[in-house]
């Protein structure tokens, strides 16, 4: 199992980064918030989880071991695969997600892409006693301007000018106030690609 990757960032995309370590380029899937902390050409270190399937071996990267452990805990729930678990961590940071599960906040959990009411209830039922809750974190609004910073940072990390990134992000959030970080980033990239 590959537990961590450290090396030069070769490429950053919407959903993954390529990090060269010991002459090998590793494609690591990650959340937009994690990707926003990386810079092309700079050295990076990600804690990883390697998921082996019949037809693929995929690395998922996280800023810290707490996020990775929460990801692996989510995978223990029936019906939750790596893409949904990563989507949950893209929607909410670790303490907020733990709080939502601990409080049984099904409404907040259904905001996660591909998670319906039954899956959200199963998450709460299965994980309520397994995840610690943070008393200081409330469930933040999934959309709105709380995602502006990570989207702008991700765009700048992809090589866009700060002003361009801010303008595109503001336009996207004005049109789609309930957008998630990943959908806002996609829309902003689409908008910037048309210029």
UniProtKB/Swiss-Prot annotation:
Gene Ontology cellular-component terms listed: cytoplasm; Holliday junction helicase complex; Holliday junction resolvase complex
Gene Ontology terms describing biological process: DNA recombination; DNA repair
InterPro entries: DNA_helicase_Holl-junc_RuvA_I, NA-bd_OB-fold, RuvA, RuvA_2-like, RuvA_C, RuvA_C_sf
Span list, region Domain I: 1-63
UniProt-annotated stretches for the region Domain II: 64-138
Pfam families: HHH_5, RuvA_C, RuvA_N
Segments for region (Flexible linker): 138-142
Chain positions covered by the region annotation Domain III: 143-195
Entry annotated with the keyword Flavoprotein: no
Molecular function as annotated in GO: ATP binding; four-way junction DNA binding; four-way junction helicase activity
Subcellular location: Cytoplasm
Keywords (A to Z) from UniProt: Cytoplasm, DNA damage, DNA recombination, DNA repair, DNA-binding
UniProt cross-references to Gene3D superfamilies, sorted A to Z: 5' to 3' exonuclease, C-terminal subdomain (1.10.150.20), DNA helicase RuvA subunit, C-terminal domain (1.10.8.10), Nucleic acid-binding proteins (2.40.50.140)
Comment, domains: Has three domains with a flexible linker between the domains II and III and assumes an 'L' shape. Domain III is highly mobile and contacts RuvB.
Assigned protein family: Belongs to the RuvA family.
UniProt-listed NCBIfam families: ruvA
Subunit structure: Homotetramer. Forms an RuvA(8)-RuvB(12)-Holliday junction (HJ) complex. HJ DNA is sandwiched between 2 RuvA tetramers; dsDNA enters through RuvA and exits via RuvB. An RuvB hexamer assembles on each DNA strand where it exits the tetramer. Each RuvB hexamer is contacted by two RuvA subunits (via domain III) on 2 adjacent RuvB subunits; this complex drives branch migration. In the full resolvosome a probable DNA-RuvA(4)-RuvB(12)-RuvC(2) complex forms which resolves the HJ.
Role according to the record: The RuvA-RuvB-RuvC complex processes Holliday junction (HJ) DNA during genetic recombination and DNA repair, while the RuvA-RuvB complex plays an important role in the rescue of blocked DNA replication forks via replication fork reversal (RFR). RuvA specifically binds to HJ cruciform DNA, conferring on it an open structure. The RuvB hexamer acts as an ATP-dependent pump, pulling dsDNA into and through the RuvAB complex. HJ branch migration allows RuvC to scan DNA until it finds its consensus sequence, where it cleaves and resolves the cruciform DNA.
Protein name per the record: Holliday junction branch migration complex subunit RuvA
Organism name: Mycolicibacterium vanbaalenii (strain DSM 7251 / JCM 13017 / BCRC 16820 / KCTC 9966 / NRRL B-24157 / PYR-1) (Mycobacterium vanbaalenii)
Organism ancestry: Bacteria, Bacillati, Actinomycetota, Actinomycetes, Mycobacteriales
């Amino acid at each position: 199992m590959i537990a961590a990757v450290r090396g030069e960032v070769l490429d950053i995309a919407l959903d993954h980064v390529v990090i060269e370590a010991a002459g090998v380029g590793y494609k690591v899937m990650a959340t937009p918030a994690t990707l926003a902390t990386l810079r092309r050409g700079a050295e990076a270190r990600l804690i990883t989880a390697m998921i082996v399937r019949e037809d693929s071996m995929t690395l998922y990267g996280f800023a810290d071991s707490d996020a990775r452990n929460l990801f692996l805990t989510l995978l223990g729930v029936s019906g939750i695969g790596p893409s949904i678990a990563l989507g949950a961590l893209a929607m909410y940071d670790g303490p907020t997600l733990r709080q939502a599960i601990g409080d049984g906040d099904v409404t907040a959990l259904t905001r996660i892409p591909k998670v319906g009411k039954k899956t959200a209830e199963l998450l709460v039922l299965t994980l309520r006693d397994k995840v610690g809750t943070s008393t200081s974190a409330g469930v933040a609004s999934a959309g709105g301007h709380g995602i502006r910073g990570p989207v702008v940072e991700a765009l700048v990390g992809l090589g866009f000018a700060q002003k361009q990134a801010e303008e595109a992000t503001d336009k996207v959030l004005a049109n789609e106030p309930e957008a998630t970080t990943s959908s806002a980033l996609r829309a902003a990239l689409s908008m910037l690609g048309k210029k």
